[in-house]
């Protein structure tokens, strides 16, 4: 089926009508079950997140904001990053968006932009953040050559012992049993973080995991 979008979809979100929205190289794609619609804001959209109401939050290069419908249902883009001070404008791509405690978090490489009641707070990181995850209302980030951190307030709290695998590119952080974390690396297998220790998870597929690039992962109940 021709959908009229670009060649790559980065993330997918769904609204209360079960309509699908895809962050696409050509803009925001909407599928209502019958047909595709493209809403373009002239940017490659890297990530999209539906807030459970009427907004589809999106992130792009040096820009983030939201699409919302007009009285006829047509989606229009509203930039939030346009209100930033000039010194914060060059933040590169926004790759992840989360809702935590009624605030929206936009995560780029060196900045987290927290939207609360239409006000934006800027949280800066010296190291590049290459991966992030919202786990049980906690925002975790992997910082290049530094390890995994819990972000809270304006602070990044290091998870002890994760620095020993900080030169491995962690591509995914997942919840695991008994409040542990699974740290998925691109070429060095899977690690378990348990309070203060980080150890390899030995599996029958270790050779495959270490010879393949692990770009994303998900926990399944079965």
PLM region descriptions:
Residues 1-222:
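Carboxylate-rich, polar loop motifs that coordinate divalent cations or form catalytic acidic clusters
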């Amino acid at each position: 089926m021709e959908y009229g979008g670009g060649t790559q979809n980065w993330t997918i979100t769904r609204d209360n009508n079960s309509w699908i929205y895809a962050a696409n190289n050509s803009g925001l794609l909407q599928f209502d079950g019958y047909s595709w619609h493209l809403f373009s804001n002239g940017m490659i959209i890297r990530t999209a997140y539906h807030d459970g109401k009427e907004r589809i939050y999106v992130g792009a290069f040096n820009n983030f904001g939201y699409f919302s419908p007009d009285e006829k249902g047509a989606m229009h883009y509203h930039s939030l990053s346009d209100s930033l001070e000039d010194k914060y404008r060059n933040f590169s791509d926004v790759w992840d968006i989360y809702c935590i405690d009624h605030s929206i978090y936009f995560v780029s490489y060196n900045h987290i932009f927290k939207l609360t009641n239409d006000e934006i707070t800027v949280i800066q990181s010296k190291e590049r953040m290459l991966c992030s995850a919202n786990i049980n209302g906690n925002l975790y980030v992997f910082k290049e050559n530094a390890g995994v951190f819990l972000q809270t307030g304006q602070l990044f709290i290091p998870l002890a012992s994760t620095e020993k695998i900080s030169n491995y590119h962690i591509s995914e952080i997942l919840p695991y049993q008994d409040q542990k974390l699974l740290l998925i690396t691109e070429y060095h297998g899977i690690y378990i973080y348990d309070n203060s220790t980080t150890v390899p998870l030995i599996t029958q597929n270790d050779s495959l995991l270490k010879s393949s690039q692990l770009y994303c992962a998900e926990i399944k109940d079965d």
